[in-house]
UniProtKB/Swiss-Prot annotation:
InterPro entries: RIP, RPA_interact_C_dom, RPA_interact_central, RPA_interact_N_dom. Coiled coil: none annotated. GO terms for cellular component: nucleus; PML body. It comes from Xenopus laevis. It is found in: Nucleus. GO terms for biological process: protein import into nucleus. Mediates the import of RPA complex into the nucleus, via its interaction with importin beta. This is RPA-interacting protein A. Pfam families: RPA_interact_C, RPA_interact_M, RPA_interact_N. Keywords: Metal-binding, Nucleus, Zinc, Zinc-finger.
């Protein structure tokens, strides 16, 4: 107890020396857990605000970084070296230290909120992409992604459209289902890193064979579909 009182007296009214290091490391850990946050976001779907305090990872990030810094000699004052983050909070009575942790928590919540808003845009774009594929596909027919007017004739050997598209697919064993899957996966994959809808075109390669390309002027992406 005496050590705790000396510690509080030493830093009373000043910024705790661990604050900036802990804050930076928490922010970095949250950003590194971006894919984990996206997975959690996908799992809850419409229950976006169902997490504790409206957060998905902030508490977990703060606890993990706390434990990581505990393992580094001298990183935290000895009074904090408890078995769990919650236990340490229970003994903290210094208003400056509590305010510091709350400040860090609020910053992390804002960072997480910004990431979630980005994820919402990504998921919205994915839905638009899927809608685009649905619009291209009617029953057992697919609208040509190049002209967006005529239905494609799809066989195991070729794909052809009245607009002039002709692609030899003999070596690929093409079908309506396979083409639909290729278009859907390509649009979804593009949507992970760009929010603009790409366009489709046909180009002849060096060997003389025609291929279907998907390209985007926004992100300069170009993908061979088939």
């Amino acid at each position: 107890m005496e050590a705790e009182r000396r510690h509080r007296a030493l830093y009373k009214g000043t910024t705790p020396p661990w604050k900036e290091t802990y804050r930076k490391r928490c922010v970095e850990r949250l950003k590194r857990n971006r894919s984990k946050l996206l997975d959690k976001f996908r799992q809850v779907g419409e229950r976006i605000h169902g997490g504790v305090g409206g957060s998905f990872l902030v508490q977990e990030v703060m606890e993990e970084e706390w434990k990581a810094m505990q393992s580094e000699n001298g990183s935290f004052p000895s009074m904090w070296k408890k078995e769990a983050f919650s236990q340490a909070l229970n003994i903290m009575r210094d208003p400056d230290e509590l305010a510091t942790l709350e400040e860090i928590k609020q910053e992390l919540l804002l960072e997480e909120k910004a990431m979630i808003e980005e994820f919402e845009n990504i998921l919205q774009f994915e839905e638009q992409c899927l809608d685009s594929v649905v619009e291209l596909s009617t029953g057992d027919q697919i609208v040509c992604p190049v002209c967006n007017r005529n239905y494609l004739t799809v066989t195991s050997c070729f794909i052809v459209c009245q607009c002039g598209v002709y692609i030899n697919t003999q070596s690929q064993g093409m079908s309506i289902e396979k083409l639909h899957s290729l278009l859907e996966s390509s649009l979804t994959s593009h949507g992970y890193h760009c929010t603009k809808l790409p366009v489709f075109s046909v180009a002849t390669e060096l060997g003389g064979a025609a291929s279907l390309f998907m390209s985007c002027q926004e992100c300069d992406a170009m993908v061979v579909i088939l």
